Design a protein with these regions (language model features):
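A cross-family phosphate/adenosyl-ligand binding-site feature
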Residues: 2-129, 135-201
Length: 201
């Protein structure tokens, strides 16, 4: 009698992308555009607010963005695959991440699939990156961010870099997206790596 074949423990090349209603939806769009060229299976969930912000800030329509993902999940579908810990993924990134979404994730009191999927990633000890897009922050926000860091999330505010001497808004977006993907162990050609500056006298 043959022994049962052991289950594979290899994590699928599968990533959850959450887009909330904060300003900066273009970062989420660009990330999907980049990942579409890779072997990574992307699972997208956009909040209703994200769809509104997208139309206001960019020339994209929600259907254009959904076409970039491997799989789409309605924000109200709390029974989706990504709402279960048994659905293995590399992790999740919420980009941009609104203060409301951040707060729901920190408390575990979730109202949509964006925050529910993030909560699942945390409880399963997978990588969760939150690209916060808000300023200024009051003490309550900062305490919530501290809680998120303590429970395992990577708090990565969207902050542009200038050491790479960007020549356009696209350069800034691409570099930021590349750095966010770095946090998930995904290598791209988007980041100009710092190799040290001139020595001081």
């Amino acid at each position: 009698m043959k022994e049962p074949r052991p289950m594979s423990t290899k994590t699928p090349r599968r990533l959850v992308i959450g887009i909330s209603g904060a300003s900066g939806t273009i970062y989420g769009v660009r990330m999907l555009e980049i990942l579409k060229k890779t072997d990574i299976e992307t699972h997208l969930v956009m909040s209703k607010s994200a769809e509104m912000t997208l139309v206001y800030e960019t020339s994209y329509k929600p259907k254009d963005v959904r076409a970039l993902a491997s799989v789409n999940h309605p924000a109200a579908d709390i029974g989706a695959s990504i709402s279960s810990g048994s659905f293995a993924t590399m992790g999740m990134i919420v980009v941009p991440c609104s203060i409301r979404t951040m707060s729901e994730i920190a408390t575990g009191v979730t109202s949509s699939l964006v925050s529910r999927a993030a909560d699942v990633v945390l409880k399963e000890k997978r990588r969760l990156v939150l690209a916060i897009r808000e300023t200024p922050l009051h003490v309550g926000h900062l305490r919530t961010l501290t809680t998120l860091a303590e429970i395992g999330a990577v708090v990565a505010p969207i902050v542009p870099a200038f050491y790479n001497k960007p020549k356009s808004v696209d350069d800034i977006i691409n570099h930021t997206v590349g750095r966010l993907l770095d946090l998930l162990g995904i290598e791209t050609k988007l980041v100009k790596r710092w190799e040290g500056g001139p020595a001081e006298d």
